[in-house]
Amino acid sequence: PFEVPPAWFAVVHPGIGVPTAGVFQAPELTRNSPPATIRGSLPAGWTSQPLPGRNDLEPVVRARHPEVAAALERLGRHGEARLTGSGACVYAAFADERAAARAAADVAAGWQGWAVAGLARSPLLARLERERRSRAGGAEG
């Protein structure tokens, strides 16, 4: 485990869906990216800015879906905008809730925007650990 600094995110949905299969089947998709690890891509003292890594799906989605490209550009006015997975949502990291909320509110008609707090720990992992402890405690009694 490693510490993840607190961060706020603006998440914007541009009102369309992006078929994941089509993105992964795209002939223009880069398929020879070097492997990366989360720990290896976080520089010492990282504070959520700039975001580490890259998303090889982003150029494909940007080229095929103008709405996503527009959302990336618009959110990019406020911070470093990135594609979530294969889309269609885009996001940017911010140091505080106010900046994230301001960016999330700057959406075009038909889009949705949210300001959300980043999580330092997966809720699913925490639940699995609680259940494991509970089962282990019950087995001893």
Question: Positions of the model-derived regions?
Answer:
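Short beta-strand->loop micro-motif that forms the acidic, two-metal-ion catalytic signature
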Residues: 89-95
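Glycine-rich beta-strand-to-loop/alpha-helix junction loops that act as flexible
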Residues: 84-88
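Conserved, helical-rich catalytic subdomain that frames metal- and/or nucleotide-binding sites
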Residues: 1-80, 95-141
